[in-house]
């Protein structure tokens, strides 16, 4: 409290006027102090100033990462736009046993069937000689078996020879017979669907010509 005394000079009786004015002191807080001390004031001051955690360096890194992901192409979960050709259609190609060696290459007397063969398969089949089967057994069993196969409607082979034997061979199963086929696939099918005579053995082979 501040006391202001005004003195008026007069001839008769001096008079005193008292004027009271409230001034800020240590006991009376000001408006600015109340605003800073109150929690509401803190919330307002914080809300008025927006904060940002991203810096220019981090934003630059994000832009670079986005460009790298675009250049890298589709991820593992995405389907690529182009697919490899081949293998999508039904039906498998006829597989050959193996590529012909230089000793197996010869001249064939018949054209190779192109159905079910790729370009590589055709070249390998054309390079091979006519596939054959050599039967070994007794003369009677081979003759009877040949007679039945020649009279059947579905023979499944190209040519079949007569029963013959090597000169000087006196073994029990000394008789031989040759069966020629168009392709290795036909030969495999013949072996799969036909029974050979009892105690008869066979082996694969090929000839330059028939």
From Swiss-Prot:
SUPFAM superfamilies from the UniProt entry: Viral DNA-binding domain
Entry keyword annotation includes Ion transport: no
Keyword Hydrolase included in the entry's annotation: no
Bias-annotated ranges (Basic residues): 62-71
Protein name: Protein E8^E2C
Biased composition (Polar residues): 24-38
Region (Disordered): 1-119
The species this protein was found in: Human papillomavirus 65
Family, per entry: Belongs to the papillomaviridae E8^E2C protein family.
GO cellular component, one term: host cell nucleus
Function: Plays a role in limiting the replication of viral DNA in keratinocytes. Recruits the host NCoR/SMRT complex to viral replication foci to mediate repression of both viral replication and transcription.
Compartment(s) where it occurs, according to its Swiss-Prot or TrEMBL record: Host nucleus
A Pfam family: PPV_E2_C
């Amino acid at each position: 409290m501040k006391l202001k005394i005004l003195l008026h000079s007069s001839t008769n009786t001096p008079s005193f006027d008292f004027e009271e004015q409230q001034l800020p002191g240590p006991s009376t807080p000001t408006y600015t102090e109340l605003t800073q001390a109150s929690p509401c004031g803190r919330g307002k001051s914080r809300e008025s100033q927006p904060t940002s955690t991203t810096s220019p360096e981090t934003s630059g890194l994000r832009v670079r990462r986005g460009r790298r992901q675009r250049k890298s192409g589709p991820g593992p979960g995405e389907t690529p736009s182009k697919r490899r050709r081949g293998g999508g259609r039904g039906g498998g190609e006829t597989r050959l046993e193996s590529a012909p060696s230089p000793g197996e290459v010869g001249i064939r007397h018949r054209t190779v069937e192109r159905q079910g063969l790729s370009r590589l398969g055709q070249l390998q089949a054309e390079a091979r000689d006519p596939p054959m089967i050599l039967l070994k057994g007794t003369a009677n069993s081979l003759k009877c078996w040949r007679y039945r196969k020649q009279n059947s409607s579905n023979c499944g082979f190209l040519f079949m020879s007569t029963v013959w034997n090597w000169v000087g061979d006196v073994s029990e199963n000394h008789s031989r017979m040759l069966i020629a086929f168009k392709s290795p696939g036909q030969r495999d099918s013949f072996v799969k669907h036909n029974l050979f005579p009892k105690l008869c053995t066979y082996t694969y082979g090929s000839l330059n010509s028939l």
